[in-house]
C-alpha cells in the first residue's frame, strides 16, 4: 500500500470573499429578556441591495441586535412605517409600539457596484434627539461587514458597551472519513455570526486548540502533521507559519499573555503534562507547575498577574489559580465533579468554564469572590467555551442532530443560539479580540 502523506494547504488570505449560503441563526430564547431595549429597524430607503448572504443591511442589523440578548427588535409586521425623510417619521406610532429607539437609513448607488450608506439612530421620545448619524461609502462585498459595524455603533451608543459584531471566531471543523479517505481537519475563521467561513489550514491530521493573539493578527494552534504534536503560530494576512514548540510528547493548549509577549503552553518534558511559559522574543522556556498531577488548559488573567488552569491534583478535574507574584497555587472550583476550560471575564472578577453536574456537561460562570456558580447552559454535551471580548456572550461547541455545532449563550444565560456551519463536526471555538481600531 502506498504510504499516505499529510495534506497541508495554507490558504494565504482571509480577505477573499467566498459566497456560501446559510440559513438564519437558530435562536432559542430560554426565558424572557425583561431588561431588553425595545428598538425598531426600518427598511432603508433606496434600492433593496442584498449584502453577501442574501440579507439586506437592516436584516443583518436586526439579527445582530436581537441575538445579542440586549435588545427586543420589533418584528417585520411593524416595519411598514417607511419614511422618505426623518421629518416623515410617525413618532406617535412608534411610541404606541413601546419602542424606545428607531434606526432609519438610506442606500444610494454610486456606480461600479459601490454604494453610499447612511443611517440615523433616533430617540423616539425626543424627535430632536438624533443619537447617532453616520454615512459610509463601500463596495458591494463590504455591505455585510458595514452592517455589522453599524450594529456595533448602535450597541455601544445604547448600552455603553462596545459591540462584538465585527469580530471573528476560529474553530476546527472535522469532516468524517470515507472508506478510502482520511478524516479532514480544517481550521476555519468566520464572522462572529458564523457567516463567511474561510479555511486557514486543511490537514488529514488533527488540529487542536486555536487561540488568538491579543492584536487579532495571528492564531496559535496545535497540529499533528508529521504524526507528532507541535504548536504553530500563523499570520492571518500572509499565511506565514512559525513553529513555536515541538518538544517530545505533548505540545498543547497554547494561550497568549495579555501583552502578547508570552505564551503559556502544556508540555510533558518531565513526564506528566505541566504548564510552561514561553517568551516569544527569545524562546526562553520555564516550567511553573510541578508534581505528579496533570496540569493543562492555561488561561491568563486580564492583568497578566495570574493564570487559571485545569488539574486533577485533588482527584477530579478542577480549576486552580497560579500567582506569578509568589508562585502560589489555589483551588478555585468546588461545585461539581468536573470543571475545566476556564477563562476570566474581562473584569477579572468571575470566570466561565466547562462544568459537569449530575452527569451533564454545560457552561457555567463562577463569581471569584463568593464562589457562587451560575449554570448558563446544560444540554449535556456543551464544551470548550470562549468569551466575546466584551464579556457579554460566550461561544462553545455542542452536539446537535448527531454532530458538533457552534452555539452561543449570553453571560446571563437568557439567550442561546446555534450558528450555521458546514457539514461536519465543529470543535474548540475561539472568539477573537476586538479587531482594528
Curated annotation (Swiss-Prot):
Highest taxon, organism lineage: Bacteria
SUPFAM superfamilies xrefs: TolB, N-terminal domain, Tricorn protease N-terminal domain
Cellular component GO terms held in the UniProt record: periplasmic space
Keyword Aminoacyl-tRNA synthetase in record: no
Signal sequence interval, chain numbering: 1-23
Family membership noted in the UniProt record: Belongs to the TolB family.
Purpose of the protein: Part of the Tol-Pal system, which plays a role in outer membrane invagination during cell division and is important for maintaining outer membrane integrity.
Subunit structure of this chain's protein: The Tol-Pal system is composed of five core proteins: the inner membrane proteins TolA, TolQ and TolR, the periplasmic protein TolB and the outer membrane protein Pal. They form a network linking the inner and outer membranes and the peptidoglycan layer.
Name the UniProt record assigns to this protein: Tol-Pal system protein TolB
Organism: Coxiella burnetii (strain RSA 493 / Nine Mile phase I)
Source lineage: Bacteria, Pseudomonadati, Pseudomonadota, Gammaproteobacteria, Legionellales
Amino acid at each position: 500500500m502506498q504510504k499516505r502523506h499529510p495534506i497541508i494547504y495554507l490558504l494565504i488570505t482571509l480577505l477573499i470573499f467566498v459566497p456560501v449560503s446559510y440559513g438564519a441563526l437558530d435562536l432559542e430564547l430560554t426565558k424572557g429578556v425583561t431588561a431588553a431595549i425595545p428598538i425598531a429597524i426600518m427598511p432603508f430607503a433606496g434600492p433593496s441591495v442584498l449584502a453577501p448572504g442574501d440579507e439586506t443591511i437592516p436584516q443583518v442589523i436586526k439579527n445582530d441586535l436581537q441575538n445579542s440578548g440586549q435588545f427586543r427588535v420589533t418584528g417585520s409586521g411593524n416595519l411598514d412605517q417607511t419614511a422618505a425623510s426623518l421629518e416623515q417619521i410617525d413618532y406617535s406610532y412608534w411610541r404606541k409600539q413601546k419602542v424606545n429607539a428607531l434606526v432609519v437609513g438610506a442606500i444610494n448607488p454610486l456606480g461600479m457596484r459601490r454604494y453610499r450608506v447612511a443611517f440615523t439612530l433616533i430617540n423616539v421620545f425626543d424627535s430632536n434627539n438624533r443619537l447617532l448619524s453616520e454615512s459610509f461609502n463601500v463596495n458591494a462585498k463590504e455591505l455585510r461587514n458595514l452592517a455589522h459595524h453599524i450594529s456595533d455603533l448602535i450597541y455601544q451608543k445604547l448600552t455603553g458597551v462596545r459591540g462584538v459584531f465585527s469580530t471573528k471566531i476560529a474553530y476546527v471543523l472535522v469532516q468524517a472519513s470515507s472508506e478510502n479517505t482520511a478524516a479532514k481537519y480544517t481550521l476555519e475563521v468566520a464572522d462572529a455570526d458564523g457567516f463567511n467561513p474561510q479555511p486557514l489550514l486543511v490537514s488529514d491530521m488533527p488540529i487542536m486548540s486555536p487561540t488568538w493573539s491579543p492584536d487579532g493578527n495571528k492564531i496559535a494552534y496545535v497540529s499533528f502533521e508529521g504524526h507528532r504534536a507541535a504548536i504553530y503560530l500563523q499570520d492571518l494576512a500572509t499565511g506565514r507559519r512559525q513553529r513555536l514548540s515541538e518538544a517530545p510528547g505533548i505540545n498543547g493548549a497554547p494561550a497568549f499573555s495579555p501583552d502578547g509577549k508570552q505564551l503559556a503552553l502544556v508540555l510533558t518534558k518531565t513526564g506528566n503534562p505541566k504548564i510552561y511559559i514561553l517568551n516569544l522574543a527569545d524562546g526562553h522556556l520555564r516550567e511553573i507547575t510541578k508534581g505528579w498531577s496533570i496540569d493543562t488548559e492555561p488561561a491568563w488573567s486580564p492583568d497578566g498577574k495570574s493564570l487559571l488552569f485545569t488539574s486533577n491534583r485533588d482527584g477530579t478535574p478542577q480549576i486552580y489559580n497560579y500567582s506569578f507574584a509568589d508562585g502560589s497555587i489555589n483551588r478555585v472550583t468546588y461545585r461539581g465533579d468536573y470543571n475545566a476550560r476556564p477563562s476570566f471575564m474581562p473584569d477579572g472578577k468571575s470566570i466561565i468554564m466547562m462544568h459537569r453536574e449530575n452527569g451533564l456537561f454545560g457552561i457555567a460562570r463562577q463569581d471569584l469572590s463568593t464562589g457562587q456558580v451560575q449554570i448558563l447552559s446544560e444540554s449535556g454535551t456543551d464544551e470548550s467555551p470562549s468569551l466575546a471580548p466584551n464579556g457579554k456572550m460566550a461561544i462553545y461547541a455542542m452536539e446537535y442532530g448527531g454532530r458538533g455545532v457552534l452555539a452561543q449563550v449570553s453571560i446571563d444565560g437568557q439567550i442561546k443560539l446555534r450558528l450555521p456551519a458546514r457539514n461536519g463536526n465543529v470543535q474548540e471555538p475561539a472568539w477573537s479580540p476586538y479587531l482594528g481600531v
